[in-house]
Amino acid sequence: MKRNHDFSSSDSELDENIEVEKESADENAGANSPLGSMSPSTTSQVQARKRRRGIIEKRRRDRINNSLSELRRLVPSAFEKQGSAKLEKAEILQMTVDHLKMLHAAGGKGYFDAHALAMDYRGLGFRECLAETARYLSIIEGLDNTDPLRIRLVSHLNSYASQREAHSGLGHLAWGSAFGTPPSHLAHHLLLQQQQQQGAPLARSTSSPPSSNSSSPSSSSPSAPSTEPRLSGTVISEAGQTGPLRVPPSTSLPPGLTPPTASKLSPPLLTSLSSLSAFPFPLSAFPLLSPSSLGPATPSSSLGKPYRPWSMEIGAF
């Protein structure tokens, strides 16, 4: 009896082998029969089995092609090369094996952390959007690879994607820990500002201890106007003075009254600010405010224009 050697890997492989063996047996029986030919019903069954085999084989090939397309989209190295040239199936499988080896060598680091996994998929999505943007510029807008606008835009997006990938390895902080420290740090200065306005009508330093706010208004000294730390060139006024007093840029303040700079911020604030660099929005959209500018405006009529750095950043949102 003729044996079947079909090496199909479909789900219904066993049924297909059984059907082929029956078909071969029917053919052999028909050849050895005295009539020497098969009946019409047997011929129709054989043709139906052949058609069914073709459908099963087509489904198997479609499933393989769909899986290869998913691998080409998910593997970073294969995804970056899909726009330049058509990848063969062997190349896609090889890149997948290399990617899995790299993950195995790294011990699966990052793929057990939900935040790191989301950041990884975000990078893949950004790369996919970058490829779609380049395709749109070339097909719809008609910009070739030598166009300066296309070169500038694509290089900017590539550099941004590289920075995102570099910043994703700084530390996996949640959104709450990244934004938890600055509000508490600023709330301390707001509390001091409220105590200052309730205790004395004169402007006082927010960096001074709260015990200095309990002094009477009549004990103000000539150095009282300079106790309010502001940025250089801003107005420092007092309720009893008739004209504003400006601090030149070269004026040196006492060590305890220096304006807050990025190098003298508290370590938790610096840590939270450094963690913010891993997120998409720039820090320039949120300028550091001086503590004295966070309180409500004083009723003095000699105050200059209020310090509002956010008015220049409204367009960023």
Curated annotation (Swiss-Prot):
Keywords assigned by UniProt, alphabetized: Developmental protein, DNA-binding, Notch signaling pathway, Nucleus, Repressor, Transcription, Transcription regulation
Region named Disordered: 1-59, 193-264
Composition-biased stretches (Low complexity): 193-226, 248-264
InterPro entries documented for this protein: bHLH_dom (IPR011598), HES_HEY (IPR050370), HLH_DNA-bd_sf (IPR036638), Orange_dom (IPR003650)
Keyword Metal-binding: no
Domain bHLH: 48-103
Ranges of residues in domain Orange: 121-157
GO terms of molecular function: protein dimerization activity; RNA polymerase II cis-regulatory region sequence-specific DNA binding
Record has Transcription regulation as a keyword: yes
Cellular compartment(s): Nucleus
GO biological process entries: cell fate specification; circulatory system development; Notch signaling pathway; regulation of DNA-templated transcription; regulation of neurogenesis
Expression induction: Expression in the developing embryo is induced by activation of the Notch signaling pathway.
GO CC aspect terms: nucleus
Residue numbers covered by motif YRPW motif: 307-310
Compositional bias per record (Polar residues), positions renumbered to this chain: 30-47
Disulfide bond annotation, renumbered to this chain: none
SUPFAM superfamilies referenced in this protein's UniProt entry, alphabetically: HLH, helix-loop-helix DNA-binding domain, Orange domain-like
Protein family (similarity comment): Belongs to the HEY family.
Known function: Transcriptional repressor which functions as a downstream effector of Notch signaling.
Protein name: Hairy/enhancer-of-split related with YRPW motif protein 1
Gene source species: Danio rerio (Zebrafish)
